[in-house]
């Protein structure tokens, strides 16, 4: 092979490798998946890219926090207890969506917004497969 034919092949290989190296960095730029007490969760929903993140449908629970006028609230705190009253999850988020990886079952949720100024208690039922979605409107 001559020097002239090696150069384009080498350039193409380097370009491909640099593109592949950029993919993991791009994938990590989104909202992080966190963990509290062994439960995976994410705080998301700020911006179109976050709301369209393909990872979110895999979470069995999606709680969306909004004001009475429909605007998103970005500071929810959530505590989830199981049917026996045992706390299984608690977190403070900086985005209006709280996505939680809970096993199937019935849970009680205590949620606060606007730095604890408003609170709401409600039940959720998590089924096997699919996503339980609840919009919580706080005045």
What do these predicted ranges mean?
Residues 2-13:
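Bacterial N-terminal signal peptides that target proteins for export
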Residues 14, 44-47, 96:
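General secretory precursor processing signal
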Residues 22-24:
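N-terminal signal peptide c-region/cleavage motif recognized by signal peptidases
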Residues 26-76, 80-81, 113-139:
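Primarily secretory-pathway and cell-envelope proteins
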Residues 85-95:
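Short, acidic Ser/Thr/Gly-rich low-complexity loop/linker segments typical of extracellular
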Residues 95-101:
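Short, surface-exposed beta-strand/beta-hairpin micro-motifs centered on an aromatic residue
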Residues 103-104, 128:
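Surface-exposed loops/turns
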Residues 105-111:
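A short tyrosine-centered beta-strand micro-motif
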């Amino acid at each position: 092979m001559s020097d002239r034919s090696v150069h384009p092949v080498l350039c193409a290989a380097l370009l491909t490798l640099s593109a592949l190296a950029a993919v993991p960095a791009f994938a990590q730029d989104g909202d992080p998946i966190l963990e509290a007490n062994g439960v995976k969760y994410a705080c998301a929903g700020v911006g179109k890219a976050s709301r369209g993140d393909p990872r979110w449908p895999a979470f069995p629970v999606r709680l969306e926090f909004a004001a009475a006028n429909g605007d998103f609230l970005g500071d929810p705190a959530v505590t989830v207890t199981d049917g026996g009253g045992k706390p299984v999850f608690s977190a403070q988020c900086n985005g209006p969506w709280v996505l939680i990886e809970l096993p199937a079952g019935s849970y009680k949720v205590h949620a606060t917004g606007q730095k604890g100024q408003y609170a709401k208690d409600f039940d959720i039922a998590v089924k096997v497969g699919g996503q339980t979605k609840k919009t919580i409107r706080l005045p």
